[in-house]
From Swiss-Prot:
Catalytic reaction(s) noted: (S)-4-amino-5-oxopentanoate + tRNA(Glu) + NADP(+) = L-glutamyl-tRNA(Glu) + NADPH + H(+)
Subunit structure: Homodimer.
Name of the protein: Glutamyl-tRNA reductase
Enzyme class: oxidoreductase
The record's note on its domains: Possesses an unusual extended V-shaped dimeric structure with each monomer consisting of three distinct domains arranged along a curved 'spinal' alpha-helix. The N-terminal catalytic domain specifically recognizes the glutamate moiety of the substrate. The second domain is the NADPH-binding domain, and the third C-terminal domain is responsible for dimerization.
Entry annotated with the keyword NADP: yes
Amino acid sequence: MQLTAVGLNHQTAPLSIREKLAFAAACLPEAVRNLARSNAATEAVILSTCNRTELYCVGDSEEIIRWLADYHSLPIEEISPYLYTLGMQETVRHAFRVACGLDSMVLGEPQILGQIKDAVRVAQEQESMGKKLNALFQKTFSVAKEIRTDTAVGENSVSMASASVKLAEQIFPDIGDLNVLFIGAGEMIELVATYFAAKSPRLMTVANRTLARAQELCDKLGVNAEPCLLSDLPAILHEYDVVVSSTASQLPIVGKGMVERALKQRQSMPLFMLDLAVPRDIEAEVGDLNDAYLYTVDDMVNIVQSGKEARQKAAAAAETLVSEKVAEFVRQQQGRQSVPLIRALRDEGEKARKQVLENAMKQLAKGATAEEVLERLSIQLTNKLLHSPTQTLNKAGEEDKDLVHAVAQIYHLDK
């Protein structure tokens, strides 16, 4: 089995497909353990974000696709048009590019590196990684650090979090006059809330499954923020001008009916809703309602392109460095694969040496002169070491030119 990657991202699949193949954080440990113990793979790392789901494996790509479809209870023909399958060298290049932010919706964005590290940590905890994936991701982190240090690929990057505020400012003239509701209390919500807090909105509320986690985030924000439970949403939604949601829920949290009731109470005042979750937290039908402005991660593309031209110049230098690092990694791995062969070759040489030496000692014991023994020893050793290569070459003839060329290279006969 070889190193391979199977996946889809914002470039190959719409949100409606990506959300079907996303892995909830709570399910990821069991999923990666299951994959690494299946017929599809012997090693596995699963990366699942709002913009991509990728399975890095040592395994059979066709079986991995079948496992992915079975896991999500989807027919293969429904998902296969959106998937990419990568060979060994392509997988290495892709991992490097993703970690550097070169394959992101926001060119050079830094969050993806942390997400990969989290995916690797989960895989390590589940013992689903072996030598090949450990080597790949150790090198991936090293390359990402070097590229982000030596190039400007991540500079002037507009993050999804900062873009959320920019989008709200296109609808409302002053964030300071708004009530803002955050649904969820994870990393993405914390980032977005931090940007909104800098604009000093009139009120910020964090709704979460547990009140303690919501309160913890409110304390971090250090502004006029209060916690509430998800179960409170139907009663309070109408009080907010901006709603930003990003949870790990597999089902929508905010439905069309809930928003309809809130809009009636708001008496035609606009409601800006940003759904950053995959799968979606807010029902897509909400976007059909008058005065409800619903945006998803795919709608953020144009906003996050700010500063892209400057980053693209830096990306060209980063791509060159990635190519160099891919070639370096592949050479290292091929060298390691040769180690057992080298060891076996040396063992054969040692075996021949001992046999010839044993014969020489017997001849010396019988009274043969040292010169005679050394002469025979050298002839026997030459014959033993060259017998197998000579036989193989005789059988190969002109039909196997690669073998003939390889032997010529090994013995430096092609000069």
